[in-house]
From Swiss-Prot:
Associated with the spliceosome. This is Pre-mRNA-splicing factor CWC2. The keyword Cell cycle applies. Involved in the first step of pre-mRNA splicing. Required for cell growth and cell cycle control. Plays a role in the levels of the U1, U4, U5 and U6 snRNAs and the maintenance of the U4/U6 snRNA complex. May provide the link between the 'nineteen complex' NTC spliceosome protein complex and the spliceosome through the U6 snRNA. Associates predominantly with U6 snRNAs in assembled active spliceosomes. Binds directly to the internal stem-loop (ISL) domain of the U6 snRNA and to the pre-mRNA intron near the 5' splice site during the activation and catalytic phases of the spliceosome cycle. Residues 270-288 have a biased composition (Basic and acidic residues). PANTHER family: PRE-MRNA-SPLICING FACTOR CWC2, PRE-MRNA-SPLICING FACTOR RBM22. Belongs to the RRM CWC2 family. Residues 141-218 form the RRM domain. Residues 1-27, 270-292 are annotated as: Disordered. It comes from the Eukaryota. Pfam families: RRM_1, Torus. Keywords: Cell cycle, Metal-binding, mRNA processing, mRNA splicing, Nucleus, RNA-binding, Spliceosome, Zinc, Zinc-finger. GO terms for molecular function: pre-mRNA binding; U6 snRNA binding; zinc ion binding.
């Protein structure tokens, strides 16, 4: 029996793909000019100086979200961090991995804000070359992209940049410096920027270049600074509002409306018919001056207080004007001269 209302089948989640085999990736490291490895800045220090950009090697693997993303053991265990090797396209575990194999969503919340989306600890300051994990003192959403192989057509270059970097998240702003091979890309969240930085490091777009992807320095434009501060303030307000109880928020708004005299803004109050007021009663309508009683209520209280005081004074005045009874004359009234017995 067929029914008209057909329900679309639910899309099954696919397991994460094993991007590489454990023996496919060349794990040999290049020549390190440094003598000591600085665990704080995650780089070598000391030794001979060399051009770090000239010694870069093209990455052997690359992540393709539509093909590699899927569920892993982290979806069952509740781990909120993404897999760093998945972003680089070289995770051999696939669905058996203990980390997430997907892009961080805009609503993605991490248990520790001092770590990036991969679980790596951030530092107080950026590295001198603006590489590495980043800083926890600033929410950076902008990436610096260097060594871009430019195209004669500017529109084609813009399309190529947005196609390759738009795969890792929503791009809210971008700027291409034509003639310099440099571009700046701003993502919606810092988690997306961190993921894109690792995914596109030492990669190439449509050419054979090796991209230099770093964190961007702070924008010196005053307008951008004000907009960023406003955005962070709005995010904080939404986060605080999400943790508050709705009944508590409504009660607070009601109390504030009573204090400000703007009750009509929250509750619809029907206009009542004007009542006949006493001749001596002042009819004043004033705005609230703070507190639980507005100007009208205070005038009413003052009026009734003065009225009660006036009535009390009138009672005292009446008590003073009443004459006292003559006791002597009332005693003599019993001895009348018209009595026959006398």
């Amino acid at each position: 029996m067929s029914s008209d209302n057909t329900v679309a089948p639910k899309r099954k989640l696919k397991p994460a793909r094993k991007q590489v085999a454990s023996d496919e990736v060349d794990k040999s490291q290049g020549y390190q000019a440094g003598r000591e490895y600085n665990i704080w800045y995650n780089k070598w220090a000391g030794g001979d100086r060399e051009d770090a950009l000239a010694s870069k090697v093209h990455s052997q693997t690359r992540c393709i979200i539509s093909r590699d993303a899927g569920y892993t053991r982290a979806d069952a265990t509740g781990n909120k961090y993404c897999c760093l090797f998945f972003a680089r396209g070289c995770c051999p575990y696939g669905y058996e991995c203990q980390y997430l194999h997907r892009l961080p969503l805009p609503s993605h919340q991490l248990p520790d804000n001092s770590r990036d989306c991969f679980g790596r600890e951030k530092h107080a300051d950026y590295r001198d070359d603006m590489g590495g994990v980043g800083s926890f003192n600033r929410q950076n959403r902008t990436l610096y992209i260097g060594k871009i192989q430019e195209s004669p057509d500017k529109k084609q270059m813009t399309e190529t940049l947005l196609r390759h970097f738009g795969e890792w998240g929503k791009i809210v702003k971008y700027n291409i410096l034509f003639g310099r091979g440099v571009a700046f890309v701003t993502y919606e969240t810092d988690h997306q920027a961190s993921f894109a930085k690792e995914a596109m490091a030492n990669q190439s777009m449509d050419g054979d270049e090796i991209l230099n992807v770093r964190w961007a320095t702070e924008d010196p434009n005053p307008g951008e600074k004000v907009a960023e501060e406003k955005r962070i303030e709005e995010i904080g307000q939404k986060a605080i509002a999400g943790m508050l109880d709705e009944n508590l928020v409504e009660a607070t708004q009601a109390v504030r409306a009573l204090e400000d005299g703007d009750v009509e803004d929250f509750y619809h109050i029907e206009t009542s018919k004007p009542e006949e007021e006493e001749e001596n009663r002042p009819a004043k309508k004033g705005k609230s001056e703070g507190g639980f009683f507005n100007a009208d209520a205070l005038d009413n209280i003052k009026f009734y207080a003065e009225l009660a005081k006036k009535q009390a004074e009138e009672e005292k005045e009446k008590a003073r004007k009443v004459p006292a009874k003559q006791v002597g004359m009332s005693l003599l009234g019993g001895y009348g001269s018209g009595d026959e017995s006398d």
